[in-house]
Swiss-Prot record:
Disruption phenotype: Mice are viable and fertile, with normal growth and no obvious abnormalities. They show normal B-cell development and peripheral B-cell functions, but have mildly altered thymic development probably due to enhanced TCR signaling. This results in a greater susceptibility to autoimmune diseases. Residues 73-76, 172-175 are annotated as: Interaction with GRB2. Expressed in thymus and spleen, with highest levels in immature thymocytes (at protein level). This is Signaling threshold-regulating transmembrane adapter 1. InterPro entries: Sit1 (IPR033269). It is found in: Cell membrane. It comes from the Eukaryota. Negatively regulates T-cell antigen receptor (TCR)-mediated signaling. Involved in positive selection of T-cells. GO terms for biological process: adaptive immune response; regulation of T cell activation; signal transduction; T cell homeostasis. Phosphorylated on tyrosines upon TCR activation; which leads to the recruitment of PTPN11, GRB2 and CSK.
Amino acid sequence: MSRDYNCTTDDQLAWGIPSISHAWGLWALLGVVTVLLLISLAALLSQWTRGRRRNQEGQGPLSGRSAEEVPLYGNLHYLQTGRLSQEPRSEEQDPPSSGGLARGAEEAMCYTSLQLRPAQGRIPSSGNPIKYCEVVLDSEPKPQAPGPEPELYASVCAQTRRGRASFPDQAYANSQPAPS
C-alpha cells in the first residue's frame, strides 16, 4: 500500500512542513506573527521595568497597598442609623426642627477622605488633613439584623445633608440592604 504524494521529499523541510519556495505565504505569515510577538514582549518588559522603578520610589500603583491604606468613598449614612435611606428628602419638605439626637443622626452624612496616607519615610503632602469627628447615633434601639455588622476601614467625617449631596438611589461601600 503506497501513498501517492503530490510533493516530493525535496519540497518539504520535514514531514508536513513545506519548503519556502512552495509555501512562501505561510512562511511570511509566520514571520509577521513572530515579529509582532517580539515587539509585544519588548513593550511588556519595558512597562514592567518602569513599574518596578516606580514601586521602589514609592509612587507605584495601589495594588500593593492594604485595604486600610486606601480610603473608601461614599455615603455612609447606614453606619449612623443602621438603615439605608430609601427616599431623598428636600429641605422644603422637611424644615429643620428640634428633633433631638434622632433627628441629628438622620440629617448627618458621612464621607471619607480621598487622600492616601503618605508612604512611610516620606513627607506628607500639603493637602487637607483627614478630619475625625464623632458620629451621632439615634436614641432608638436598633433591631438586631441577622449576621455580623459590616466592617469599614476608613476614617469618616460627619457632614449635614446641606453640605454634601446624598445619593439615595445607589448602594455604597459596605452597605447592606435594609431588613424587610
